Amino acid sequence: MTKINIDILISLIPMLLVAFFVYEITPILVILSSVITAELAEVIFSFFIQKNRDSLKELSGITIGALTGFVLAPFTPLYVAAFAGAMATIFGKIIYRGTDKKIFNPVILGKLFVFTFFPAVLAPNSPAWTDAEGMRIASDNVSGLASLVLINRGIIGELSIAAMVIGAIYLIYRTKMTWHIPVSFFVTIFFGYYITSSNNVNVVTTLGEIIFMGIFVLTDTFTTPRHGLGKVFFGFLAGLSTIIFWFLGIQTEAIIYSVLILNPFTRPINTIFKPNVFGDEAVSFAEIIQGLGFAIIIVLLAFAVSYLHKFGFVPYIVYIYVVYGIWRLYNNR
């Protein structure tokens, strides 16, 4: 596990350098704030309270904190970034007593907590997204092919598509990531872009954010399927549910909701799409029917969550989850 986290952290270096080049020190401080509180939560709860002496060696707190920082706005208040890192670690990993036992993606949870408790910070018109005085390059100076190398808008992790591709190539080279989830997610999303544009649906999610989430967030080791066909199925459904949310008027939270809906289905998907004793991943008719059943359930859940979002009930679900998490912390002492 330690080697995986080290490789993930190395893959983030190109994006870290780009963030510093575009916005100077501010986004670095945002990421650092998230990392510090994530690791502090790891020390307090895992090391001292749960007596898990090996937790710090995994570097999972640092990795969760770093990735959580990368999905925030470049000028997110440092106390909000610190809150996100701590919540991601506590309620995404620690309450389940280990990285390999977690159900929900910690990074996604960290961002959802920000949406819930600090909704104005990541609003589209929030000053956290841009600061003319803190930018080294003006928006008018980046266009065309140059925007693939460098942009100056969006979450910290999406400021350079080229940097993201370098990070992805490194992870694939180090066999810490496969193509299955990102490619199936991207193909579905790009097809969805065509459909939404044909139906005059305004999609505000940026290409850079889609790429970053598909490469560095959706591929989390223990909250996504293990096998090739299962990964493709997962990526496709993540893209499909995201498109559904777009059509139903949900934009900034679309990918977050999609991943959280899918995470609890990881183990059943592993069961359906596991290779046979000879390593063959061929799918039987019964497994296809089971997969279709899961797909229908996930689509229905996407519609259900959209209505909960519309009527403002999602924060209350988060509050209930917080109570559940505190209860687990108490019982896991």
Where are the predicted features?
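Structural signature of hydrophobic alpha-helical transmembrane segments
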Residues: E24-T37, F75-A86, S147-I161, S198-I211
